[in-house]
Amino acid sequence: MTDEGPGMCWCLRRCGRNTEDLLLPDGEEVTLGRGLGVTYQLKPTLCPLMISRTHCLFKQNTGGEWTVTDNKSLNGVWRNKERLEPHKAYTLSEGALIQLGVPPPNMESAEFEYMLVREHLEKLSGSLIRPLPDKTKATRTKRKFTSEDTDASGNEGPSNFSIPKFYRVSREDEDSAKSSHTTDLYKQPTVEPTASGTESRLNDSVEAEVVAPTQQQCRSTLQLSRVRQTMEEIRRLNVQMQEKQMEMQEKLNSPLENQVGANSVLAVQKELRALHNHLSNEQEQHMQSVKELKEIFEEEQQSMGSRKQVEEEHLKEQLAQALQEHTQLMQELNRSKNDFEQIIEAKNKELQETKEEKEKVFAQKEEVLNHMNDVLDNELQCIICSEHFIEAVTLNCAHSFCSYCIKSWKKRKEECPICRQEIVTETRSLVLDNCIDSMVDKLSPEMKNRRAALILERKEMVQAEESNPVLVVSDSSSFLSDTFYISSSSSDSDELGNDFWMRSEEEEYEETLFGCGTDELDSSDFESDDDEEEDSFLII
């Protein structure tokens, strides 16, 4: 980072409102702070204590690069937004951002921010800041006490105030004091108790009435710093007055007091009066500063109270508005609730009506089904098998029977079982079959299954009769008493002893074969037209 061209130099350029350049001479150590023993003195305006007395220092390393070191400052040093550790050197590159302290409240950037730049010295001539002179940077020497001062302080005993840093009268003035004016000196008012009492009262007033300000209250902070300065000045003047009195006491007690001239005594008295007047002025100024600080504090309290009152009013307005919105919302919810209750009530009423209608329809359906069952049982039932017509057949006399039942009946009689009219024609009644099927479809599943089983059983019986014919052997003279049925296969029709069964009662034969009682079929139906007693054989 050494200069490459003539006239080029390194400097710290301030960022923000004020454009200032701090020159960094090669090979020299540059210090920044608010104290007197620094290269460039920084005077903060927003917060006086933001910058330390010796805040940081800049110097070049062996490679010619500039480095920055935090001198254990209170508010720190930042390089490119990163805080540096105290007493540790950090190298800087061109364009590096150096921040001293932290940003004050309600501000985004710190008051002192610098950027390391490299420019021609001619361009920087108008914005360069002059460093402090060497005499201000020199350290102050400590005051040396003579043997007489040491003895005097030892004779007087311990004092509550420190004596260094204050002016003392010369030895010539001490020798010019005269004993003839001792009474005049004793008539002078004593300043020590007055000054110390005033100082104690001022300290009490400051501690009782002044509250330590925060960094947000910059005005009160500045005023408080002035108050502290005046208090220091009052202490210094008070110590000077005490020293003068101690010197006068020494002069009075010395053996050379008779040799003191009147002029020197008057000079000392004049100096004491001047110090007393100066102290009085400082006290008045201090009281005025305390009064101003109190007024500032009261103004801040009033402003805070007014802001608090405004905030409370604003919060009350927001609360009232929120309550109003809540009330409106509750009203809307109540209206919606009432509407929903009305809708639910209407739906319940509609549901009840629908339920009643369904019950009525179901009752009507039950009534229709019962009527259909009555019709099926009374009008569409075969008189032979007492079941609903299966393949209904209508005779010439208009009576209807099952096809299987009438065929079985015709094997014994060729006349209608109801009206005894001769059977001439048989007609299939598809209308009855379709009507019965439609009505059965609307009945219970048990009825449907029962009818399907009957139809299947009838088909099996027809197929069995077609495959195995039955031979009926009967005696015409004794048919009503004894009847024999012998069944055999078609291949061996002459043998009649394989499978047979016998029934003795005529009623049982009629119920088994035709499904009707003897009240409808009498014994005359089975009498033969032939009067001769002979055996007859019927093969089915």
Curated annotation (Swiss-Prot):
Which pathway or pathways does this protein act in?
Protein modification; protein ubiquitination
Q: Which UniProt keywords apply?
A: Chromatin regulator, DNA damage, DNA repair, Metal-binding, Nucleus, Transferase, Ubl conjugation pathway, Zinc, Zinc-finger
Q: Does the keyword Transferase apply?
A: yes
Q: What class of enzyme is it?
A: transferase
Spell out the GO cellular component terms annotated for this protein, sorted alphabetically and separated by semicolons. chromosome, telomeric region; cytosol; nucleus; site of double-strand break; ubiquitin ligase complex
GO terms in the biological process aspect are: DNA damage response; DNA repair-dependent chromatin remodeling; double-strand break repair; double-strand break repair via nonhomologous end joining; epigenetic regulation of gene expression; isotype switching; negative regulation of transcription elongation by RNA polymerase II; positive regulation of DNA repair
- On whether Iron is a keyword of this UniProt record, the answer is no
Any single Pfam family the record assigns to this protein: zf-C3HC4_3
Q: Which residues form the FHA domain?
A: 30-84
What is this enzyme's catalytic activity, as reactions? S-ubiquitinyl-[E2 ubiquitin-conjugating enzyme]-L-cysteine + [acceptor protein]-L-lysine = [E2 ubiquitin-conjugating enzyme]-L-cysteine + N(6)-ubiquitinyl-[acceptor protein]-L-lysine
Q: Name one GO molecular function term.
A: zinc ion binding
Q: Look up the EC number in the record and give it.
A: 2.3.2.27
Chain residue ranges for the region called Disordered? 128-205, 517-540
Q: Where in the cell is it found?
A: Nucleus
- SMART domains linked to this entry: FHA (SM00240), RING (SM00184)
What residue spans carry the Polar residues bias annotation? 152-162, 179-200
> Where exactly are the zinc fingers annotated as RING-type?
382-420
Q: Where is the composition biased (Acidic residues)?
A: 519-540
Q: Which InterPro entries match?
A: FHA_dom, RNF8, SMAD_FHA_dom_sf, Znf_RING, Znf_RING/FYVE/PHD, Znf_RING_CS
Q: What does its UniProt record remark on the domains?
A: The FHA domain specifically recognizes and binds ATM-phosphorylated MDC1.
Q: What does this protein do?
A: E3 ubiquitin-protein ligase that plays a key role in DNA damage signaling via 2 distinct roles: by mediating the 'Lys-63'-linked ubiquitination of histones H2A and H2AX and promoting the recruitment of DNA repair proteins at double-strand breaks (DSBs) sites, and by catalyzing 'Lys-48'-linked ubiquitination to remove target proteins from DNA damage sites.
> What family is this?
Belongs to the RNF8 family.
Question: What is the protein's quaternary organization?
Answer: Homodimer. Forms a E2-E3 ubiquitin ligase complex composed of the rnf8 homodimer and a E2 heterodimer of ube2n and ube2v2.
Q: What is this protein called?
A: E3 ubiquitin-protein ligase rnf8-A
Its organism's taxonomic lineage begins at: Eukaryota, Metazoa, Chordata, Craniata, Vertebrata
